[in-house]
């Protein structure tokens, strides 16, 4: 097999959470262009339908399932549906996440649990269901989107880094427990990306200046710049990559 063929996702089926827009959508776009049948998830059926239509118009194979990621039973039903309709689930991208920027003293116990449910335990539950399905075919790729803020912490952002470090631990546990079964587990740790959610920040002159100061590439990342990293980890070009965190931050995390 030639090297370019190893990046093909033909006949692969993937779930990408939080993929109606932003980084998740760009990953979905790359996967469909590489030949995968991608299931997009999120809360808004309207947003997901528009995203799926965009992918289909470009010749991609895509469907969607609208549900709250904290509804773990709904995630399990999606895995079962994919197994019934396709016979195999090959790739899971744990991308969905929320943000609540506050110092710890301002969090109630329930506030903490709400963020942890969305950013951590939902991925644990869906990964559990996914590896059970993948194990039936002896093949799988699990990619978990973490953040450089899992190990470089900003003031007043107490719980988000906790969840992101937890996701790294999940990724490594899956890598150790399931690698011998043909299922690899890796993570992507993004830096500053100019997604729709961050659009106002990315255009703020102070944040533009901050990026020039802190990021060696002197700019924010564009959403499509994460797609190549995800495609690599999902493909047969990464068959011996397992338990790895691939940082995609323009060098921000290595600059003093």
Ranges and model annotations:
Residues 2-5, 152, 231, 242-256:
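Short C-terminal tail/terminal secondary-structure segment
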Residues 13, 20-22:
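Conserved glycine-rich cofactor-binding loop
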Residues 147:
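Residue(s) in the substrate-gating loop at a strand-loop-helix junction
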Residues 179, 184, 241-243:
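Short, small/polar-rich loop/turn modules that mediate ligand/substrate recognition or access, typified
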């Amino acid at each position: 097999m030639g090297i370019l063929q190893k990046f093909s996702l033909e006949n692969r089926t993937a779930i990408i959470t939080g993929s109606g827009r932003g980084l998740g959508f760009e990953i979905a776009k790359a996967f469909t262009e590489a030949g995968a049948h991608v299931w997009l998830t999120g809360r808004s059926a309207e947003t997901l339908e528009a995203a799926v239509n965009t992918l289909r118009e470009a010749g991609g194979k895509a469907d969607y399932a609208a549900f709250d990621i904290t509804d773990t039973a709904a995630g399990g039903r999606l895995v079962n549906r994919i197994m019934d309709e396709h016979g195999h689930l090959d790739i899971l991208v744990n991308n969905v996440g929320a943000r609540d920027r506050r110092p710890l003293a301002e969090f109630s116990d329930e506030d903490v649990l709400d963020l942890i449910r969305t950013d951590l335990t939902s991925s644990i539950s869906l990964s559990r269901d996914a590896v059970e399905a993948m194990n039936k075919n002896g093949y799988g790729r699990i990619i978990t989107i973490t953040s450089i803020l899992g190990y470089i912490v900003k003031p007043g952002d107490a719980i988000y880094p906790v969840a992101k470090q937890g996701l790294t631990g999940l990724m490594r546990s899956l890598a150790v427990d399931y690698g011998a079964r043909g299922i690899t587990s890796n993570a992507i740790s993004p830096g500053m990306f100019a997604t729709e959610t961050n659009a106002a920040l990315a255009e703020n002159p102070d944040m533009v200046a901050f990026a020039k100061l802190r990021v060696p590439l002197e700019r924010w990342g564009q959403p499509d710049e994460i797609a190549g990293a995800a495609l690599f980890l999902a493909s047969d070009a990464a068959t011996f990559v397992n338990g790895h965190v691939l940082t995609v931050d323009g060098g921000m995390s290595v600059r003093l």
